[in-house]
Amino acid sequence: MENNSSNAAYLRSERVEYELTNDSTDVKLSFPSLLDNKISLLKGHCCKIDHIVLEYRNQVPINATGHVIIEIHDQRLHDGDSKQAEFTIPVQCNCNLHYYSSSFSTMKDINPWRVMYRVVDTNVINGVHFCRIQGKLKLVNCKRSPNDIQFRSPKIEILSKAFTERDIDFWSVGRKAQQRKLVQGPSLIGSRSMRYAPCSIGPNESWAVRSELGLHEPWAVKERGWASIERPYNQLNRLNPDALDPGKSVSQVGSDQFTREDLNDIISKTVNICLNTSMQSHVSKNV
């Protein structure tokens, strides 16, 4: 890509002849020179390519067929999302293509804009110089970017009288819907564990004695000096210890009463019952 000075309103590239090809090929554009970029950086300016004009002039016979597809890409995005606009014109249609930018860029990065063309469904021989294209860029430098840039849709100026708006088409990218990203903060339990330190229960202590939870009571306010509406179990230690003692666990109760002799007795009784049942069934069948 060529460099040029930004003193004029538009940066004009040379009018270049392009060969017919079915593969995407770059169109030459003129961008600010390295010196202009340095000056803008020193001034703290950002840059916006406000307007892109592509002047297309055909060089094909009158009975030539096919369509030229011209795409404008922003290389700051991945390949699947980089396309900003697309124009489709008949290969014989002389026209001017206009695209208006909707974003700012910094002078610190390589110019993000890229224009490419290709020809489809044509009877023109591949490799023939079928057209001439000149690119014009209008840049805007400013101290601070506004919050939003007003959208202006692309347009095509048709210069050939043999064609109308029904013979061309163009498309421009729209704003993608944004989905809210939820904060991956700590869970509710994790938040509580950070806010309240876990209580340690010592020997001969119940959980209620060590708990810091309790209801809002006059005596609680007097003793602690603050309301405790969110702490409903803070004063359980005032209850009788018997009311708080759940007793022995199931494993403790079972281990005190169940022995190996009890297990052997259960097995013996079960075997005898099975044998008696089997013998009675055999006798009844013989009778």
From Swiss-Prot:
The keyword Transport applies. Keywords: DNA-binding, Host cell membrane, Host endoplasmic reticulum, Host membrane, Host microsome, Membrane, Phosphoprotein, Transport, Viral movement protein. This is Movement protein BC1. It comes from the Viruses. The lineage of its organism: Viruses, Monodnaviria, Shotokuvirae, Cressdnaviricota, Repensiviricetes. It comes from Indian cassava mosaic virus. It is found in: Host cell membrane; Host microsome membrane; Host endoplasmic reticulum membrane. Belongs to the begomovirus movement protein BC1 family. Disulfide bonds: none annotated. It is a peripheral membrane protein. One of its GO terms (molecular function) is DNA binding. Binds to dimeric supercoiled plasmid DNA. Phosphorylated. Pfam families: Gemini_BL1. GO terms for biological process: transport of virus in host, cell to cell. GO terms for cellular component: host cell endoplasmic reticulum membrane; host cell plasma membrane; membrane. Transports viral genome to neighboring plant cells directly through plasmosdesmata, without any budding. The movement protein allows efficient cell to cell propagation, by bypassing the host cell wall barrier. Begomovirus genome is shuttled out of nucleus by Nuclear shuttle protein (NSP) and the movement protein transports the DNA-NSP complex to cell plasmodesmata and facilitates further movement across the cell wall.
